[in-house]
Amino acid sequence: RIKAAAGKVPVQSSLYPSPGTNKLADQLKIVAQLIAGGLKTRIYITNLGGFDTHSGQVDQTLGTEYGDHTDLLGKLSEAILAFQEDLRILRADHRVIGMTFSEFGRRIKSNASFGTDHGESAPIILFGKAINRGIIGTNPVIPIPASSTDNLAMQYDFRQVYASVLKQWFGVPQAMLDAVLLQNFQTLPIVGPFPRPALPIINQNGPVSVAGGVPERIALHQNYPNPFNPSTTISFTSTGEPVSIRVYDTLGRE
């Protein structure tokens, strides 16, 4: 079925870079091909690695406009531009929105290795014909002087963004949202009043309930290092009963 969907789209946008030069663009090209070919997959996850810039985030000689971070943002921009143009050519741009997400943010100021360490907040980029244009949030207040340990304050919980997309784009009922996210999160004006096909909702027979992932009598402590490859140390406190811990990556693999 996947091969059949891909085979229906022989011509795509010329804005894509040469294959192998932009991993994200290569993936998004395939996604556009499958969507336009009629594959019914609701959510596609693509990946652009390299943002864990503890060192070499900027070029120590040429300045902040050069370095790994600039290169990554350039690839992100290039890939999204080609993807959106491709969807327009394939007449599927009214049916697709995109969102960036990461498992960590960055600090305000660089460390001694010309990089930044893990931080408490990060920007999220949403794109597509149905997305309201503009910036949600205000310019952050940066302490003077700032140090490499200072964080930007989080303005919106990332679960607010997820709730907004699920409700405004996928049409998930509020009761189901509250059950999945474990509480009610105020939504944000992300998706505009753009005409698009109604997405069916799978009927749920009976009440929806989600059990907490960690019982109150068990304390799960921060693992280290984080992120890690290939191993990390996980510690926890319990009252002596058997405990099972499973680790999943961002693609949901155990």
Predicted regions and their residues:
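Short secondary-structure junction motifs
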Residues: 41-43, 93-95, 231, 242
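Conserved beta-strand and immediately adjacent loop positions that scaffold enzyme active sites
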Residues: 97, 123, 244
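Residue-level signal for well-ordered, solvent-exposed loop/turn and beta-edge residues enriched
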Residues: 251-253
